């Protein structure tokens, strides 16, 4: 029987167990405890691990099998989303309101009981943003923030953490623009952690953890994209995703 490793909160450079040591039930639970220091968080992402826990719980570290990912060419733009992209007055920016996007993701939702984005998590990812490691895409309508996405970047891999919408399709619009720009910059992997029906409709594929780790390794050798991030003026997300599609 595999036993969970308890991490020492005072040793941020403590190595994680190998991802393949994660439990099968609950799927992917690997370690408990530690802290959310930038050093430990970035070590986790480099090893295919991420934190996910609720209020009142210790920090829980996960590496599920299978893993939900977007790869270049995977993103599916439906007819309705294409119409939204072509007709909407929504505007998309990068890295202009990171804290507001995280707050939007942490806000209560009708279909959820509580939030996993605790105050501790908000502080930790805000610090990563200040260090140039965490990034956001903001979706605006008439000057109001109506949606967004945030996550962590490591060389050629982006690890999506959460997204939110205050109007129909706002998060899809933000995700469409963000992934298009990432592919343009040469990113090789967008990690969604775990798939769900919403993401599956957009093209997320589930791959075995072993394959995920194989794909992560070369992505981590790609060049670093320095902050601040901005969308390229000539970027057309529909054309960019179509260009990446296979025959």
Curated annotation (Swiss-Prot):
Lineage: superkingdom: Bacteria
Keyword terms, alphabetized: Acyltransferase, Cytoplasm, Transferase
The keyword Acyltransferase is annotated on this UniProt entry: yes
GO molecular function per UniProt: leucyl-tRNA--protein transferase activity
Major location category of this protein: cytoplasm
Biased composition range(s): Basic and acidic residues: 238-247
Disordered: annotated span: 227-247
One biological process term in Gene Ontology: protein catabolic process
Catalytic activity: N-terminal L-lysyl-[protein] + L-leucyl-tRNA(Leu) = N-terminal L-leucyl-L-lysyl-[protein] + tRNA(Leu) + H(+); N-terminal L-arginyl-[protein] + L-leucyl-tRNA(Leu) = N-terminal L-leucyl-L-arginyl-[protein] + tRNA(Leu) + H(+); L-phenylalanyl-tRNA(Phe) + an N-terminal L-alpha-aminoacyl-[protein] = an N-terminal L-phenylalanyl-L-alpha-aminoacyl-[protein] + tRNA(Phe)
GO CC terms, sorted: cytoplasm
Gene3D superfamilies reported for this sequence: Leucyl/phenylalanyl-tRNA-protein transferase, C-terminal domain (3.40.630.70), Leucyl/phenylalanyl-tRNA-protein transferase, N-terminal domain (3.30.70.3550)
EC number: 2.3.2.6
Location in the cell: Cytoplasm
UniProt function note: Functions in the N-end rule pathway of protein degradation where it conjugates Leu, Phe and, less efficiently, Met from aminoacyl-tRNAs to the N-termini of proteins containing an N-terminal arginine or lysine.
Similarity comment: family membership: Belongs to the L/F-transferase family.
Designated name of the protein: Leucyl/phenylalanyl-tRNA--protein transferase
Lineage, opening ranks: Bacteria, Pseudomonadati, Pseudomonadota, Gammaproteobacteria, Chromatiales
């Amino acid at each position: 029987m595999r036993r969970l490793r308890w991490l020492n909160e005072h040793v941020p450079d403590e190595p994680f167990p190998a991802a393949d040591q994660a439990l099968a039930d609950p799927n992917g639970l690997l370690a408990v405890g530690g802290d959310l220091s930038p050093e430990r968080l970035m070590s986790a992402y480099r090893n295919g691990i991420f934190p996910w826990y609720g209020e009142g719980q210790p920090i829980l570290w996960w590496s599920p099998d299978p893993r939900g990912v977007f790869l270049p060419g995977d993103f599916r733009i439906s007819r309705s989303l294409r119409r939204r992209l072509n007709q909407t007055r929504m505007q998309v920016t990068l890295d202009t309101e990171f804290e507001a996007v995280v707050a939007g993701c942490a806000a209560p939702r009708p279909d959820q009981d509580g939030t996993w984005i605790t105050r501790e998590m908000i502080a930790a990812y805000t610090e990563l943003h200040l260090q140039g490691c965490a990034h956001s895409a903001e979706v605006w309508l008439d000057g109001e923030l109506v949606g967004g996405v945030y996550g962590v970047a490591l060389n050629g891999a982006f690890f999506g953490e959460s997204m939110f919408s205050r109007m129909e399709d706002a998060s899809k619009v933000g995700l469409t623009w963000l992934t298009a720009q990432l592919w343009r910059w040469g990113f090789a992997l967008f990690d969604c952690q775990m798939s769900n029906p919403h993401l599956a409709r957009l093209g997320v594929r589930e791959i075995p953890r072993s394959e995920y780790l194989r794909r992560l390794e070369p992505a981590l050798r790609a060049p670093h994209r320095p902050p601040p991030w901005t969308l390229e003026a000539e970027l057309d997300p529909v054309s960019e995703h179509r260009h990446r599609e296979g025959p």
